[in-house]
């Protein structure tokens, strides 16, 4: 079976090849994202495509796939918003996704961003890179063991983040719509209002549910402690970007770290150095560095996470091809 894998970076290629030894697919990995007619036409002669985030299987591209004879559409992501699922079903495409992969990858990045903001390391190293070795008042910080950390969303990633913060000595509290068992040793589950009221650092690990809209709103931010740090390594749509900008500018937020943006496809994966960003909110966020830290959706950009995503995607394809079904089928 011939498989086209989109958005594969050079460092990931050995993982795609190593994982394929078990499956024996005829794979071609390209760095391109599925975002134009031309990139869709790359699938000519292939039986299946494996997408990643910011690859858009919209009506235009799905029609091209159908015309080219592509049989299966897979995404090596937990999110599936980049696929027009209803139209793909109309065209008869079996689809599958990767519901989970290394939770440590995303949790570690969230903790890293929080600690960079807490200890002001981005600010400090940007100065020392210019040979300014003075220590100023902005560099002064609390120790994390003297902080309360709030985790919004106690799924697999949120629980790992809670464990890491607990291991560093922080008092960890968390909120989830479900009662979570087995976390008592490292996290106390409380209401969202209590998380907002008490936390010096809040890290978001909730799923995005379109019908519910953003979680981080002006009201959410208003309830937070003055000067608290907020981190979002979950979904860009969970955050009202304009409200966050206002909170950072006013000093309500001590800092904001994110690995995701609402509408990130317009900037992530592109070198826009020296250019004015089309989205004025993104331009404002960038200008707020080092109080705002942005990473370009690389939470899953680790050895273990990529291995998990590729292995599950290959297995999904095998299951769909052999049985027409798989545990991770998009229905």
From Swiss-Prot:
NAD(+) binds at residues 156-157, 176, 206-207, 212, 233-235, 259. The active site is at 235, 264, 297 (proton donor). The keyword NAD applies. It comes from the Bacteria. GO terms for molecular function: D-lactate dehydrogenase activity; NAD binding. InterPro entries: D-isomer_2_OHA_DH_cat_dom, D-isomer_DH_CS, D-isomer_DH_NAD-bd, NAD(P)-bd_dom_sf. Keywords: NAD, Oxidoreductase. Catalyzes the reduction of 2-oxoglutarate to 2-hydroxyglutarate. Belongs to the D-isomer specific 2-hydroxyacid dehydrogenase family. This is (R)-2-hydroxyglutarate dehydrogenase. The lineage of its organism: Bacteria, Bacillati, Bacillota, Negativicutes, Acidaminococcales.
């Amino acid at each position: 079976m011939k498989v086209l894998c989109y958005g594969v970076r050079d460092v990931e290629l050995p993982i795609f090849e190593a994982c394929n030894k078990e499956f024996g697919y005829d794979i071609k990995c390209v760095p391109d994202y599925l975002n134009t007619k031309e990139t869709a036409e790359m699938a000519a002669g292939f039986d299946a495509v494996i997408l990643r985030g910011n690859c858009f299987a919209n009506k235009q591209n799905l029609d091209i796939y159908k015309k080219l004879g592509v049989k299966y559409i897979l995404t090596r992501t937990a999110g599936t918003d980049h696929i027009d699922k209803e139209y793909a079903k109309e065209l008869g495409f079996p689809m599958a996704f990767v519901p989970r992969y290394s939770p440590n990858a995303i949790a570690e990045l969230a903790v890293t961003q929080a600690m960079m903001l807490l200890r002001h390391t981005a600010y400090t190293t940007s100065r020392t890179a210019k040979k300014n070795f003075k220590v100023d008042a902005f560099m002064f910080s609390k120790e994390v063991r003297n902080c309360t950390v709030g985790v919004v969303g106690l799924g697999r990633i949120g629980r790992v983040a809670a464990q890491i913060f607990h291991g560093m000595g922080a008092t960890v509290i968390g909120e989830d719509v479900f009662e979570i068992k087995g976390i008592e040793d490292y996290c106390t589950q409380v209401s969202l209002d209590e998380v907002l009221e008490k936390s010096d650092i809040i890290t978001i690990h909730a799923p995005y549910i379109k019908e519910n809209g953003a979680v981080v709103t002006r009201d959410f931010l208003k309830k937070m402690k003055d000067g608290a740090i907020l981190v979002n390594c979950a979904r860009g749509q969970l955050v009202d970007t304009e409200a966050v900008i206002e909170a950072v500018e006013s000093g309500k937020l001590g800092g904001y770290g994110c690995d995701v943006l609402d509408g990130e496809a317009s900037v992530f994966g592109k070198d826009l150095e020296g250019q004015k960003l089309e989205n004025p909110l993104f331009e404002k966020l960038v200008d707020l560095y080092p109080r705002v830290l942005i990473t370009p959706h690389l939470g899953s950009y680790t050895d273990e996470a990529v291995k998990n995503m590729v292995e599950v995607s290959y297995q999904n394809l095998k299951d769909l091809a052999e049985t027409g079904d798989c545990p991770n089928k998009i229905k």
